[in-house]
Amino acid sequence: MAEKLSILLAQTNPIVGNIEYNRDLVLDTIDKNKSADLIVFSELILSGYPPEDLVLKSAFQNKVCDAFHEIMDASVHSNSYIVIGRPWKENEQLYNAAIVLYKGKVFHRHLKNALPNYGVFDEKRIFAAGNENSFFEIKGNKIGLFICEEIWDSDTYSKIEGEYCDLVITVNASPYEQQKIKKREDLAMLLSQKIDAPVVYVNQVGGQDEIVFDGSS
C-alpha cells in the first residue's frame, strides 16, 4: 500500500556556469530539509539553464560531475530521495537529465525526450533525445518523471496513455511570458487527467541574460 510522501519543491535561483554556487544551493537545501521524503530541484540546476555551448566543453562537464559526486556523497546522510537536473553523458551522448539520488547512489535517471528548438531554446543542437517514459517507486508510490518540454509535447500524452501512477513530477526551467502561468496550469491539469494522478511542478526563478524565470511552482 502506498504511503504518504512529504515533498519539498526546491524553487531556487541557479546561475549559468557557476557550478560551485549551484552545488551549494543543492547541498544547503538538502541539509535544511532532512524530514522531506522527496526533494525536487529544477531542470539542469547544476549547470544552470540555458547552458548553451558551455555544456559542450569537457572541462565544464567534468566540473558538473565533480559537483554531482559531492551531492551524492552528502545524500548518504539524508533520508530523502533527491531529484537533480544535470547534463548527463551516456554512451558518448550528452543528455538533459533528471537524476534521482538516494543514500549515495543513483536510484533512477530520466533522459529528456522532447527537446525544444524555438524562440530562446536551442536544445537539439546540444543534447541527444531520450526515448522512453520514466517511472520509479518510493514507499509504494509509482512516480512518473518528466522534464519541461515533455509536458508541452503531444507525443508525451500518446506514450503515457493507459499508464498508471500515484504521482507525476515535472522539473522545469520555464521562462516567463504573458499568460504563461495559465498555460502551465492547463498543461498540468491535462497531464493529471491523462494519468489520473496529482502533478508536482517545479520551476526556477531569476534571470539569465534576456530570459526571466518566474518560478510559480
Where are these regions (language model features)?
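Enzyme catalytic cores with a strong preference for nitrogen-chemistry domains
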Residues: M1-S217
